[in-house]
Amino acid sequence: MSRPLSDQEKRKQISVRGLAGVENVTELKKNFNRHLHFTLVKDRNVATPRDYYFALAHTVRDHLVGRWIRTQQHYYEKDPKRIYYLSLEFYMGRTLQNTMVNLALENACDEATYQLGLDMEELEEIEEDAGLGNGGLGRLAACFLDSMATLGLAAYGYGIRYEFGIFNQKICGGWQMEEADDWLRYGNPWEKARPEFTLPVHFYGRVEHTSQGAKWVDTQVVLAMPYDTPVPGYRNNVVNTMRLWSAKAPNDFNLKDFNVGGYIQAVLDRNLAENISRVLYPNDNFFEGKELRLKQEYFVVAATLQDIIRRFKSSKFGCRDPVRTNFDAFPDKVAIQLNDTHPSLAIPELMRVLVDLERLDWDKAWEVTVKTCAYTNHTVLPEALERWPVHLLETLLPRHLQIIYEINQRFLNRVAAAFPGDVDRLRRMSLVEEGAVKRINMAHLCIAGSHAVNGVARIHSEILKKTIFKDFYELEPHKFQNKTNGITPRRWLVLCNPGLAEIIAERIGEEYISDLDQLRKLLSYVDDEAFIRDVAKVKQENKLKFAAYLEREYKVHINPNSLFDVQVKRIHEYKRQLLNCLHVITLYNRIKKEPNKFVVPRTVMIGGKAAPGYHMAKMIIKLITAIGDVVNHDPVVGDRLRVIFLENYRVSLAEKVIPAADLSEQISTAGTEASGTGNMKFMLNGALTIGTMDGANVEMAEEAGEENFFIFGMRVEDVDRLDQRGYNAQEYYDRIPELRQIIEQLSSGFFSPKQPDLFKDIVNMLMHHDRFKVFADYEEYVKCQERVSALYKNPREWTRMVIRNIATSGKFSSDRTIAQYAREIWGVEPSRQRLPAPDEKIP
């Protein structure tokens, strides 16, 4: 497995991040051997590369456990306010390298594996991604956990341990096929099952009203078993916990209905209960009102709240005896953050526990609930908003429906008092939507039941106040805040782009890794020839490495000197991968028209998954691959234009492609992308952005200066005006010859000669019912892309612009985001203080 060292690798050994201590390396080798033999029960004659990965993982994990136990002891002794981040998704990716980075073990492990004749990078590639998320929302939760640990907050991530995460995407004949993601097949060395904290969760049943109050009876019980994963902060010896619940049937499941011969069936039917945590719903920005999904949402909430209350009541470390019974202090000790409306049932569930079980009166319980809960909104797309049918809630959670009705009644009384006589406002603001199917609007429930409501970028938060939540803002303006999203610089710079992290550290030191605003110091290097050269060199090395990866994995040849033009994100009409396609075809047609004219060579890479039931998104993937089939095999084009669909885009692939990108495509219709976080990752890794004034792009352009950003297209106001006037695609088709040619090519089967009408649905949508107005931005987009190519011809000026972008990306650290949540929503103060290491005395 060992190979000669490249110059870059030899240079790594004189890293400013310090050499591996000899005794450290010896110790790691000893522990590696111990785990190979005693944990995995293998010797070198029968060990596979996967065994070596597991041995290394266990060796690294050993360095976490002392810190993990210490951290939890510290929290029990200090009893700080706890932060509970509730999310149906945590898109964690791989854990090994991130743990080594945060614990400063990377060099020592690299040296130890090298001395054992192993290649650490090859071992890292064996780890499965923990793909427990769809896209941005789940990845944000993962970045937030990293930042909360790095800022020393007593924080816990709570979610579901899906047996199957986001599907693996295979492209067959240009079409997306889904494959189950059996990520736990070989076991997960990072989790620790905690069966002793298993808790019951109730479903169905009925409500009995007694003199003591309401009782929820005759329920079906499913057990929630927690699995804990350590979350290390950056070099501060803090290790927090992500606790994921797995569904288990109770031992007496269905056996009370026991009849002769029924026993076997009863045992087989245990699967029905355990299906709750079987699979992640693969929808991004789309609501699918299925009973199993509602069960998942209640399952995580019910188990988590029991855990929160148990921890609140027992103030001593490891003690399960109730101590605190007064809930007045609950909001001073507990903050619950709802990541979108998916965990919104936390509000009625907390009310149920306080009123029915803890016997608080309604007003006191409501005060506690509102002070405890806060809600983050992630989208304004109407099809993404959760509206659960009343009949489903009535069957599955009858007591919660009653509580929601009571919340609604009291809420509407407040609205009526504040706006007397405004009947339509009552209808608009009700948690209950009347119609053919009566529904509960979960966003309205969250706003009513939270003390803070935030959007995830400044423009998004403004849109919330002016449009979908306008009525609520007028009632309670103090609730509404903005918290612009961020990304963790540990994973998204130090881990994925060590070359860039290194040359930055050589100029400004290493403190920027936990204080990203320090990147501003790089502004004084914009004209430094050596730094310009270094930045360009690192980018070229990353491009060569990614080109080699594509060749190895997909047998795809690309020109590493071409401009790497990258759009990677979920496939969705609002993200406008189709606009990108129109540009690619424009470039192709121009080359065909003037084959001898110089063009800046481009490799256009598009990647992302389509929800399995989203027909248009799947057609878009087929179109991208079809364009590639034509463009990549046209001898006239040569290597001046290549179109690559990146199969199975996921966290571990993002870590490879983002550092190699020259151009980042962030081209959603203004007003549709709440924030975006991929945009920030590209900026931090030295790509330039072409984008609309949408989501966080607005703030990125503000930080970098608009002259260092390729901005095009309609602003939100322009989109609104166009809506009022009526968007007519035909106007653009008639006026723009290049656009007309493309649509004719799509209609005539130019890109699908065996099936001429293959793309008729796409053409029909673009021409007649395109909600996202692709044609309206086409001309400006193509012109803006010409400016991109022109700048790319001047490598020095391009790199200077890159440096300005990197230097102004500090705002987009999730450390900044979390510090704002902490101070402005949770009422806690972040801290960069180190805990003592396990081998240090506690002061």
UniProtKB/Swiss-Prot annotation:
The modification Phosphoserine is found at S15, S430, S514, S747, S748. One of its GO terms (molecular function) is glycogen phosphorylase activity. InterPro entries: Glycg_phsphrylas, Glyco_trans_35, Pyridoxal_P_attach_site. The modification N-acetylserine is found at S2. The record marks Y156 as: Can be labeled by an AMP analog. The keyword Cytoplasm does not apply. GO terms for biological process: glycogen catabolic process. AMP binds at D43, Y76, R310, R311, F312, K313, S314, S315, K316, F317, G318, C319. Keywords: Acetylation, Allosteric enzyme, Carbohydrate metabolism, Glycogen metabolism, Glycosyltransferase, Nucleotide-binding, Phosphoprotein, Pyridoxal phosphate, Transferase. Pfam families: Phosphorylase. PROSITE patterns: PHOSPHORYLASE. The modification Phosphotyrosine is found at Y204, Y227, Y473. Allosteric enzyme that catalyzes the rate-limiting step in glycogen catabolism, the phosphorolytic cleavage of glycogen to produce glucose-1-phosphate, and plays a central role in maintaining cellular and organismal glucose homeostasis. This is Glycogen phosphorylase, muscle form. The lineage of its organism: Eukaryota, Metazoa, Chordata, Craniata, Vertebrata.
